[in-house]
């Protein structure tokens, strides 16, 4: 796939909303709208318009270097591109059938299995973590060729540190990100570790976590601290690293230079409380399917002042003022439901897995409503 559209085009269209008919209109501030999906679960096809497409558990969303939106559709095991100018979808990776195949060939002919997060490196190439194949894959966007860069397809476990990442073992990787040097970081939640793949050597190591899935102290060392269920890692423009712990019900600041971790949100207990007070005293998550709790996705504003958190099992998006440390709810009621669009305080969500802030616009992967929603704050 050849990236041809520019970031400038995205910025020009970023203040417009794609309606279900596929046309653009001005966004009404402080109202939630449906950006993509009908709410009906199905299989989106090449060329579908955003408002007519039937999504199936959209899990993660990013803006690519071409200014388009890319998202993983967990239920169909595909990755899609959404063009802001035309509102049309195109398939980037996956056949729609779960499995493992296709390395060395076109990503659109490859089988994926449970894609969670998608990210781009500095060269504009795409990375996909596949939970149920226990791997991370790479798509060369100029050619569309897919390959495996970490993990052993179909095999789970914890092994391989110090050797080639493609011979290592992961256990249901859920989140990925890349630093400015294109080193790859993998949230390896069932191993309770954050793994790192060196961009130059391809060697995998453990970057953070000691493998214990117990409650973490408020501060500790990178590799000596228990990190229960690392779920998503966000690296900000100003170089701060934030890690969400799913089973740990917290968010931690990682300092690579000092090799330390520090709690900045979540007291470690599950629940839904704390709005209006310190984020470190708040509770995230509640017992959901499989007993999963805690935050599932993070996004920080470009100025570094605000963090948004997908509090999946509470069916809300939380907001943290990183200057004051105060937490609040940005979207959702705390009850599971489907909208209605409009007032963010009254719009019910259903297990949102990801949130993305770009400029003043907030996008939400409202996963089990099979929608991507949008909020333009007042």
Task: Please report, for each region that a protein language model flagged, where it lies by residue.
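Blade-level signature of beta-propeller repeat domains, shared across WD40, Kelch, NHL, RCC1
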Residues: 351-378
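Residue-level detector of Asp-centered blade-edge/turn motifs that repeat once per structural unit
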Residues: 63-66, 120-123, 178-181, 235-238, ...
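N-terminal secretory signal peptides and thylakoid transit peptides that target proteins
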Residues: 1-18
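A short loop-to-beta-strand structural motif that recurs across blades of beta-propeller domains
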Residues: 78-80, 134-137, 192-195, 203, ...
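Gly/Pro-rich loop segments of beta-rich domains
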Residues: 27-57, 87-114, 144-172, 201-229, ...
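Conserved beta-propeller blade signature
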Residues: 68-70, 125-127, 183-185, 240-243, ...
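Short loop/turn segments immediately following the C-termini of beta-strands
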Residues: 74, 131, 189, 246, ...
């Amino acid at each position: 796939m050849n990236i041809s559209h520019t970031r400038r085009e995205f910025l020009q269209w970023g203040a417009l909303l794609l309606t279900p008919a596929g046309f653009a209109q001005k966004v009404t501030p402080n109202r939630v709208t449906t950006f993509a999906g009908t709410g009906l679960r199905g299989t989106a096809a090449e060329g579908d318009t955003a408002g007519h497409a039937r999504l199936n558990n959209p899990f993660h969303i990013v803006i690519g270097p071409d200014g388009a939106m890319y998202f993983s559709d967990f239920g169909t095991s595909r990755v899609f591109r959404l063009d802001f100018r035309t509102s049309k979808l195109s398939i980037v990776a996956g056949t729609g059938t779960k499995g493992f195949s296709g390395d060395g060939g076109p990503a659109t002919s490859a089988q994926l299995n449970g894609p969670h997060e998608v990210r781009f490196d500095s060269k504009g190439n795409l990375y996909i973590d596949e939970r149920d194949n226990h791997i991370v894959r790479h798509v060369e966007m100029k050619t569309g060729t897919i390959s495996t860069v970490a993990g052993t397809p179909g095999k789970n476990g914890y092994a391989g540190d110090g050797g080639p990442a493609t011979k290592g073992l992961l256990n249901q990787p859920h989140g990925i990100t890349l630093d400015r040097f294109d080193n790859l970081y993998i949230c390896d939640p069932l191993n309770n570790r954050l793994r790192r793949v060196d961009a130059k050597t391809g060697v995998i190591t453990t970057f953070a976590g000691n493998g214990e899935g117990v409650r973490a102290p408020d501060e500790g060392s990178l590799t000596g601290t228990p990190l229960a269920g690392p779920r998503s890692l966000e690296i900000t423009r100003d170089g701060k690293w934030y890690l969400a712990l799913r089973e740990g019900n917290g968010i931690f600041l990682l300092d690579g230079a000092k090799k330390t971790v520090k709690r900045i949100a979540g007291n470690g207990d599950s629940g839904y409380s704390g709005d209006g007070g310190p984020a470190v005293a708040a509770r995230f998550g509640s017992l959901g399917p499989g007993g999963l709790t805690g935050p599932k996705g993070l996004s920080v504003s470009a100025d570094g002042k605000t963090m948004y958190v997908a509090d999946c099992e509470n069916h809300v998006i939380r907001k943290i003022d990183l200057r004051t440390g105060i937490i609040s709810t940005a979207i959702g009621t705390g009850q599971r439901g489907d909208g209605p669009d409009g007032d963010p305080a009254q719009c019910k969500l259903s297990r949102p897995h990801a949130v993305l802030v770009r400029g003043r616009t907030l996008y939400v992967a409202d996963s089990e409503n099979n929608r991507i929603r949008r909020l333009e704050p007042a």
